[in-house]
């Protein structure tokens, strides 16, 4: 918030100046201001000598006047004192008297306390995780042994969980045939490529080193082949206009929503950019309001923020958004005191408190934005498909301006539809769930998707990090379908702004996927979701495998350069084995592999020829694709080293910290780039020098790897620049339709961000009369407290008063924010006590300037 010094502070008596400064921070009329300050004990003339302690008495009297009632003689005073008694009046002066279902938002309780409910009325139910089933082999051995002993097999509790109506849907035979076809394509293509690889090697796979190279090549090539055929089938599906099993075609686009199809739009957040979070939430809410279906939805922000400043800002932002859109009773907020199990615990806490009130829930990320039409369509699809447990949208990446992010937005927008359509083609109703921008059927989710910790010790045990794949597998195990509505429009997200922020996110995902792989052979899961676990780990395990493949290839080169050839490799061999080098075969195999990587991108361009104008025109679209291919090749070795490090770290027991990703266009500094990429540069230079020393002609083969590593520092810095991103947009490169013609929801989100004022923090919650009233009203007031708790809180108030804001830890600040009596008492003391630390006094000397944008404060009383 913008602050300035008040002009009324010159030569005023201590108690009068304090009261004037206090009233100046309240949105009151001049008449009410005069009424509050009119008191014989607060003279207006200067130069009168008054005991400084009178300032505290004057503040107390001012609080009594604000509370609009003076306690009669012998009457029990307001709980928490006169300052707490003024909370309701201060709240009403600032925010008016909002109504929720005909009742005032600010409720006055019989015990004298006031409270603002920020969440829905609780309707508690249970959500209990089940123990993980045994390994397939373990279960088979155990039951086989029991049969040999004449005992019945142990009943499998998870076999009784198939209560979903879509255990074997009409789509299942088609899906089974398609997956076998995919497996055949991958195996055939990998076998052929591995055969040609044996012809490239000098001894054709006759020694251990070459056998190891062949094994790694087969694994890596099969991974590339699976991606290639997924994209190709996606191309065919999109070219012919869609799949006949497409779930988005199962409901009429204008079908009315049933009144009992109650849906909660939940947004779990943790230490996020508050302005961006509530701007996106507001844009989504307003878009839904334009559809006329707002009555079916509630919006709930679920905060796990551990920063007291952000907690204060979130409550203030919730209030302002509700006032701006009339969202009281529709938009809710909850701050979780016991922040356990990260996002899964936050969602589970929602399910236990309010899940039984809703049939569906839509999960959003902190950077998610969805259109009202998309939300309404998701509910229609759920209603039309009673066997669907999860329907995942394919969110479009928008909103970033760095060159790196714009390239990634272009890639996901142009190539992404091929891969998501291909995934849908193979998976159908046994698909992915990505944790956000998806709708979930609440009842089966609560019954089957509670996550038990993984047994054991170490970083790959305990609470599951990457919960989404596991929840999809559990939902499908129970007989409910999991679908991707890849052609559904109106779902948006944001990407990391630079390479280093992307790999920070990848480290969390890497460890989460490695943990999930422990469930790969657990009993009860469907084969498709076993494949999902496998592809999840291969997304990161392929990096160290590729690195090892390159190291072994370098070792083979060193052996042939430094060690005399061995012509007799087998006992009693009659004829020598001559090493053969066939550069033309190696080039052909390299070209074939590059084609598998490059052809899906060309196919994507072919699909967009008619829409090329939305991408800057066909020439710029093709140029953008070519530049993206080059940049991807340059970044691939750096990503390889990062992912290799993450895999090694996970298996070595190195812990990770789970921090929220940046929600703004953060640029990489040269210092950070040197720290993070310095070892990559040295490795690239040393590796290239070694190969040149061994055989100069082989440097060209390795140049794309070592050259990229040598350039990793400037590449990382330059790609993170916003100026380069904007220049590329002005040149018409990396354009996407959402930039050429931005959706209304994205435009409004940006407008709300730009119009927002500075958010309040913990110090404002203590000092500012309005923010203090808001935080006191939204906290839970407990009139009856143990004497020990009262003593601790009273001591904390004195410690905060004399020590100032810097003397308080985060946990102490949260204690004060959670106790409205202590918070209001500290508020009174920092205004009136001579013992107040200078940190409080400096803030107290400032007056909030009236905001000039959204109506953050109502008209004066």
UniProtKB/Swiss-Prot annotation:
Gene Ontology CC terms: plasma membrane
Enzyme Commission number, as recorded: 2.4.1.-
Annotated region (Disordered), positions in chain: 65-89, 101-129
InterPro entries according to UniProt: Glucans_biosynth_gluTrFase_H, Glyco_trans_2-like, Glycosyltr_2/OpgH_subfam, Nucleotide-diphossugar_trans
Coiled-coil intervals, chain numbering: none
Domain of life of the organism encoding this protein: Bacteria
Entry's localization field: Cell inner membrane
Membrane topology qualifier: Multi-pass membrane protein
Keywords, alphabetical: Cell inner membrane, Cell membrane, Glycosyltransferase, Membrane, Transferase, Transmembrane, Transmembrane helix
Stretches that traverse the bilayer: 181-201, 208-228, 532-552, 589-609, 616-636, 698-718
Any GO BP: glucan biosynthetic process
One Pfam family named in its UniProt record: Glyco_trans_2_3
UniProt GO molecular function: hexosyltransferase activity
Residue ranges, compositional bias (Basic and acidic residues): 67-76, 105-114
Pathway where this protein functions: Glycan metabolism; osmoregulated periplasmic glucan (OPG) biosynthesis
Family assignment from sequence similarity: Belongs to the glycosyltransferase 2 family. OpgH subfamily.
Free-text function comment from the UniProt entry: Involved in the biosynthesis of osmoregulated periplasmic glucans (OPGs).
HAMAP family, sorted: MdoH_OpgH (MF_01072)
Protein name: Glucans biosynthesis glucosyltransferase H
Lineage of origin: Bacteria, Pseudomonadati, Pseudomonadota, Betaproteobacteria, Burkholderiales
């Amino acid at each position: 918030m913008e602050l300035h010094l008040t002009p009324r502070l010159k030569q005023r008596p201590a108690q009068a100046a304090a009261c004037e400064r206090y009233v100046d921070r309240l949105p009151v009329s001049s008449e009410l201001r005069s009424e509050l300050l009119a008191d014989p004990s607060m003279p207006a003339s200067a130069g009168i000598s008054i005991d400084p302690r009178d300032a505290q008495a004057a503040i107390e009297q001012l609080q009594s006047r604000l509370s609009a009632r003076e306690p009669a003689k012998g009457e029990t005073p307001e709980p928490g004192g006169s300052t707490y008694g003024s909370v309701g009046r201060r709240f009403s002066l600032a925010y008016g008297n909002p109504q929720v279902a005909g009742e005032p938002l600010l409720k006055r309780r019989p015990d004298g306390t006031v409270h603002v409910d920020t969440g829905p009325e609780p309707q508690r139910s249970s959500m209990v995780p089940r123990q993980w089933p045994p390994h397939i082999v373990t279960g088979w051995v155990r039951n086989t042994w029991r049969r040999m002993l004449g005992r019945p097999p142990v009943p499998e509790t998870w076999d009784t969980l198939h209560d979903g109506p879509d255990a074997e849907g009409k789509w299942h035979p088609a899906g089974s045939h398609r997956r076998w076809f995919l497996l055949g394509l991958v195996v055939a293509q990998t076998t052929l490529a591995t055969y040609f690889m044996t012809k490239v090697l000098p001894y054709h796979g006759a020694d251990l080193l070459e056998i190891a190279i062949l094994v790694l090549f087969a694994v890596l090539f099969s991974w590339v082949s699976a991606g290639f055929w997924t994209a190709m089938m996606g191309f065919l599906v999109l070219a012919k206009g869609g799949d006949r099993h497409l779930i988005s075609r199962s409901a009429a686009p204008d079908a009315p929503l049933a009144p009992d199809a109650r849906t909660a739009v939940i947004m779990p957040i943790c230490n996020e950019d508050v302005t961006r979070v509530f701007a996106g939430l507001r844009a989504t809410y307003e878009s839904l309001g334009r559809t006329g279906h707002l009555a079916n939805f509630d919006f709930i922000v679920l905060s796990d923020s551990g920063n007291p400043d952000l907690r204060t800002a979130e409550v203030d932002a919730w209030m302002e958004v509700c006032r701006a859109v009339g969202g009281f009773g529709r938009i809710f907020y909850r701050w979780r005191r016991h922040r356990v199990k990260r996002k899964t615990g936050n969602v589970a806490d929602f399910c236990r408190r309010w899940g039984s009130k809703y049939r569906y829930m839509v999960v959003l990320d902190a950077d998610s934005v969805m259109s009202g039409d998309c939300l309404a369509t998701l509910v229609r699809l759920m209603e039309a498909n009673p066997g669907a447990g999860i329907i995942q949208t394919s969110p479009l990446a928008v909103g970033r301006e760095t060159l790196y992010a714009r390239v990634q937005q272009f890639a996901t927008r142009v190539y992404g539809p091929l891969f998501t359509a291909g995934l849908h083609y193979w998976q159908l109703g046994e698909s992915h769930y990505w944790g956000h921008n998806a709708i979930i059927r609440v009842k089966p989710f609560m019954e089957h998707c509670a996550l038990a910790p993984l047994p054991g010790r170490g970083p790959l045990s305990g609470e599951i990090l990457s919960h989404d794949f596991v929840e999809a597998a559990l939902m499908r195990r129970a007989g409910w379908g999991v679908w991707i509505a890849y052609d559904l429009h109106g779902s948006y997200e944001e990407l990391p702004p630079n390479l280093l922020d992307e790999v920070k996110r990848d480290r969390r995902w890497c460890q989460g996927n490695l943990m999930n792989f422990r469930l790969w052979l657990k009993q009860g899961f469907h084969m498709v979701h076993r494949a999902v676990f496998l592809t999840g780990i291969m997304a990161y395990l392929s990096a160290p495998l590729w690195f090892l493949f390159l190291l072994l290839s370098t070792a083979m080169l060193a052996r042939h350069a430094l060690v005399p050839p061995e012509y007799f490799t087998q006992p009693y061999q009659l004829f020598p084995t001559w090493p053969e080098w066939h550069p033309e075969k190696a080039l052909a195999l390299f070209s074939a592999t590059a084609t598998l990587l490059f052809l899906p991108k060309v196919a994507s361009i072919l699909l967009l020829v008619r829409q090329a104008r939305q991408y800057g025109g066909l020439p710029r679209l093709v140029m953008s694709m070519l530049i993206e291919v080059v940049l991807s090749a340059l970044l691939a070795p750096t990503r390889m080293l990062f992912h290799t490090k993450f895999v090694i770290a996970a298996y070595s027991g190195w812990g990770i910290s789970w921090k929220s990703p940046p929600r703004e266009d953060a640029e990489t500094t040269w210092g950070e780039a040197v720290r993070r990429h310095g070892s990559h540069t040295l490795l690239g230079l040393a590796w290239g020098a070694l190969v040149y020393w061994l055989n100069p002609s082989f440097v060209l083969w390795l140049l794309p790897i070592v050259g990229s590593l040598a350039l990793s520092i400037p590449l990382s810095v330059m790609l993170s620049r916003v100026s380069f991103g904007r220049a590329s947009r002005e040149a018409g490169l990396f354009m996407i339709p959402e930039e050429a013609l931005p959706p209304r929801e994205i435009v409004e989100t940006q407008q709300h961000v730009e119009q927002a004022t500075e958010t309040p923090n913990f110090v404002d919650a203590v000092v500012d009369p309005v923010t203090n009233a808001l935080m006191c009203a939204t906290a839970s007031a407990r009139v009856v407290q143990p004497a020990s708790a009262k003593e601790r809180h009273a001591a904390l108030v004195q410690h905060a008063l004399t020590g100032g804001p810097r003397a308080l830890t985060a946990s102490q600040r949260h204690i004060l924010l959670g106790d409205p009596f202590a918070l209001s008492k500290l508020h009174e003391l920092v205004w009136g006590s001579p013992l107040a630390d200078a940190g409080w006094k400096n803030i107290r000397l400032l007056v909030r300037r009236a905001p000039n944008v959204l109506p953050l404060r109502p008209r004066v009383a």
